[in-house]
From Swiss-Prot:
Protein name as catalogued: Major vault protein alpha
Provenance organism: Dictyostelium discoideum (Social amoeba)
Localisation per UniProt entry: Cytoplasm; Nucleus
Role summary: Unknown, though MVP-alpha is required for normal vault structure.
Protein keywords: Acetylation, Cytoplasm, Nucleus, Repeat, Ribonucleoprotein
InterPro entries: Band_7/SPFH_dom_sf (IPR036013), MVP (IPR039059), MVP_rep_dom (IPR041139), MVP_rep_sf (IPR043023), MVP_shoulder (IPR021870), Vault_2 (IPR041134), Vault_2_sf (IPR043179), Vault_3 (IPR040989)
């Protein structure tokens, strides 16, 4: 085994490491050879393949050997190969080589990196070195631009791969300098400086350049401009103008069709064109003056037709465009001067108000404010408005004419008390009256027929009364007198709110509790007819009817007081017998002659009570009410029983009289019947005599007449039967003839249609068959025909069928119709035989 292990066969392109134990030096043996190991030698590694580097590949060797200028290995004093410990070496494509003791391959054999066009490698120097007379210091960075193959170095590290940026039309590339450098145009740039590259195409940024963004151009049109602002002082290359920091300006389509903002230009926004028609105007605030600077606090009026861009700092007053005021004959404008100015030789002080009347067109100057547009207010004879003079404060009502407010006038709103509004809303039957009421319109009220309305003027401190039917129109300082009347039964105050006072005649109902002298408490329901006696021609009488605010409550109280006093003086039985007399005397009183007066007058407001109606009288105490009810029921029962007895006696009397008349009539009828029976017997005797003598003659005569009538009837019947048979035969013949003609024409048309159909189908089938034959071919048909018969024969033989029928799926056999046809033919034959038998019987 020792001898076998001491002989090592090294293949071509393989190597081994052998250690000499005497010198402790390791050497390399390269094949092809057969190496015999000595006793003092030891195989350290191998055999291993040599390192092979293909074309366009490389590898990295750690701790490489040292070679002299001639490329020979450098040995130390012990005969051992010197190594550069801690160093690395990149080896490119060459002959296969072995690794010397101490050398190691880092990684794998790697292909060289190819840098494509429009790309570059950013390289960094790891240590100082000189290449192609260019000295690089550790930390330096530079670009290796393609297209090329990069040969790596130990001293250089690839940081990243950089791609070129494509700059399209209407685009620019914004760059920033990472440190002081020169760009590709040779312009010196400071650290942090930004600039634009506007040339179209691919741009590969330098090693000290950073791509910030791609800036797209703004397309400018006739209707769109660009608002720019300078972030710092710079030279505007487009207009060759020095721009200061914070300056703002517009770029319009006349300057350039497209604009790419510079690095020191900030796009504030896009400004759209402002267009004015010939019927429009606008006011520009802070306009740009002739010197190009904004005139702060100034205004400029611009009229159409006009199109313009608002410059930076300019704005429209109210942010809108105004239409020119077009005034008709019935319209006007109320104007107010914002400041003192003169126009057309007329001076206006600040705060002046004046009117412009139509018809005209008007564009207000910047010194004038349009307060409002006024229209002439059309008023009927029954309509009006409240107008206040803002200088004097005087309010007046304008009625019955179209009115245009003057410059120092305004509409005045008249506020009505809530009670008045509720009454007006209730009488107008409009639930939205309060919300929809125009307070500037003169308040009107239609006084109903036979009513009175009081209006009080608080300024003049006097009132007036209007009698209906009439229209009441309130002045600025006038108000309605609202009546608060009592209502319900018994009367309660403040139940009815009204403006109009009805003069009557009318009635009111009240419930009065009274007590008789024997302490019986009664509830009286009384109705009073009332009316006002007023002379409308006298103002004093008209004012007098409104002196009592609640005439209903006061009058009912007064009448109730009189009634209670009168009832208290009489007993319950007495009052129950003559309640109407007691109440009327207590209310109306007695005249000098002792008669009851016809009315009861209230002198304070001319109210007259003309009549009293007692609707009901009920005891208040329940026991009294029950006792009274029992007595009333007892009286009713007594009266009812007496009436029943009288009715029964009268009925018996009438019944006896009727029975006597019936007996008398019966006797009379029996006498008449006896007389009739006598006459009947006489007639029976006469008829018996006549019957015995003329019976034979009558029988003979009757027999002859009967035979004659029967003969005539038979003759007539025969004639009628003959005529009927003739008519029936003729009608049957004509009907049968018409039927046969119709059947023949129908069958003829059916046959013609069938012939046409069969002809068309035959043509279609022929053309179809011809087309199929032509498409399939003669030889193919022949093969199909032969194959089909043979196959069918074999198939049927295999099935064991003795009789069969073959048809295709397109022409199925209808066995049901076949059976029906057979049955139908049999039925026709039976019908024909029956018809023949019937005709034989007739013959």
């Amino acid at each position: 085994m020792a001898d076998l292990n001491s002989v090592i066969r090294i293949k071509p392109f393989h190597f081994i490491h052998v250690l000499d134990n005497n010198t402790n030096v390791t050497r390399v043996e390269v094949g092809p050879q057969t190496f015999t190991r000595q006793d003092h030698e030891k195989l350290v590694s191998g055999p291993e393949p040599m390192i092979m580097i293909p074309q366009r590949n490389y590898c990295t060797i750690s701790n490489p050997v040292v070679r002299n200028e001639n490329g020979s290995l450098v040995l130390d004093e012990y005969g051992q190969v010197k190594l550069r410990h801690g160093d690395e070496e990149i080896r490119f494509s060459q002959e296969p080589f072995p690794l010397y003791p101490g050398e190691k391959i880092s990684g794998k054999v790697t292909a060289l990196q190819v840098v494509a066009p429009l790309k570059a490698l950013r390289l960094r120097a790891l240590r100082d070195f000189t290449e192609a007379k260019v000295t690089h210091v550790a930390g330096d960075e530079w670009l290796f631009e393609g297209p090329a193959t990069y040969l790596p170095r130990i001293d250089v590290r690839i940081e990243e791969e950089i791609k070129a940026t494509i700059i399209g039309p209407n685009q620019a590339l914004k760059l920033r300098a990472n440190k002081a450098c020169s760009d590709r145009s040779g312009v010196a740039r400071k650290a942090g400086e930004e600039w634009l590259v506007r040339q179209h195409g691919a741009y590969l940024p330098g090693v000290d350049e950073k791509v910030v963004e791609i800036v797209n151009a703004y397309v400018l049109t006739d209707k769109k401009a660009l608002h720019l602002k300078a972030t710092k002082t710079f030279l505007d290359e487009t207009r060759k103008t020095q721009r200061k920091a914070g300056e703002e300006w517009l770029v319009v389509s006349t300057d350039a069709e497209t604009h790419i903002p510079d690095v020191y230009e900030q796009v504030v926004g896009e400004v759209h064109i402002t267009t004015l028609s010939n019927r429009q105007y606008c006011v520009v605030l802070d306009p740009i003056g002739a010197n190009g600077k904004p005139q702060l606090g100034h205004k400029q009026l611009r009229k159409g037709e006009l199109a313009f861009f608002l410059n930076p700092g300019e704005s429209l007053e109210g942010n809108k465009i105004h239409n020119i005021y077009v005034l008709t004959e019935q319209e006007a404008l109320l104007l107010r001067a914002k400041e003192t100015f003169s126009i057309d030789g007329e001076s206006h002080l600040a705060g002046d108000r004046w009117m412009i009347y139509g018809p005209c067109d008007y564009v207000p100057p910047v010194q004038v404010e349009v307060v409002e547009k006024r229209e002439s207010i059309p008023l009927d004879e029954n309509e009006g408005i409240y107008v206040r003079d803002i200088k004097t404060g005087k309010v007046a009502s304008i009625k019955g004419q179209s009115y245009m407010l003057k410059a120092n006038e305004e509409l005045w709103e008249k506020v009505l008390p809530r009670t008045v509004e509720e009454v007006l809303a209730k009488e107008s039957l409009n639930p939205e009256f309060t919300d929809n009421r125009d307070s500037t319109r003169v308040v009107t009220y239609r006084a109903p027929h036979n009513s009175a309305v009081q209006i009080y003027d608080y300024k003049e401190k006097k009132s007036r009364v209007v009698f209906g039917p009439d229209l009441v129109m309130l002045g600025p300082d006038e108000h309605f007198t609202v009546l608060s009347l009592s209502g319900d039964k018994p009367k309660r105050p403040h139940q009815i709110k009204a403006i109009a006072l009805f003069l009557g005649p009318d009635f009111m109902t009240d419930v009065v509790i009274v007590e008789t002298s024997d302490h019986a408490r009664l509830s009286l329901k009384l109705s009073y007819n009332w009316e006002f006696k007023v002379d409308r021609s006298k103002i004093e009488d008209a004012q007098k009817i409104f002196q009592v605010p609640d005439f209903v409550g006061d009058s009912c109280k007064a009448i109730a007081s009189r009634v209670r006093g009168a009832v208290a003086a009489v007993s319950f039985d007495d009052f129950h017998k003559r309640s109407a007399e007691v109440i009327r005397q207590s209310v109306f009183g007695l005249d000098e002659s002792g008669e009851v007066r016809k009315n009861f007058s209230f002198n304070s407001n001319n109210l007259v009570i003309t009549n009293i109606d007692i609707q009901s009288v009920e005891p208040v105490d329940q026991r009294t009410r029950d006792s009274l009810q029992k007595s009333v029921q007892l009286a009713i029962e007594i009266t009812t029983k007496s009436q029943e007895a009288a009715a029964r006696h009268e009925a018996e009397r009438l019944e006896q009289g009727a029975r006597g008349r019936l007996e008398r009539q019966k006797i009379h009828d029996e006498a008449q019947a006896e007389l009739a029976r006598k006459d009947l017997l006489q007639l029976q005797a006469q008829s018996a005599a006549v019957e015995s003598t003329g019976q034979a003659t009558a029988e003979a005569q009757a027999t002859a007449e009967a035979a004659n009538i029967a003969a005539e009837a038979n003759v007539k019947q025969a004639e009628l039967k003959a005529q009927a048979t003739k008519i029936r035969s003729e009608s049957e013949i004509s009907l049968l003839k018409a039927k046969r003609e119709n059947e023949l024409s129908y069958q003829k048309s059916i046959d013609e249609l069938e012939l046409t159909k069969q002809s068309d189908l035959a043509e279609i089938e022929a053309s179809k068959f011809k087309a199929i034959v032509e498409s399939i071919g003669r030889d193919t048909l022949k093969s199909i025909a032969c194959a089909g018969n043979e196959m069918q024969a074999k198939l049927l033989q295999g099935l064991g069928l003795k009789s069969f029928m073959i048809t295709d799926g397109k022409s199925p056999l209808n066995l049901f119709d076949t059976a029906n046809g057979i049955i139908g033919n049999n039925n026709q034959m039976v019908n024909m035989s029956n018809a023949a038998k019937q005709s034989g019987r007739r013959n």
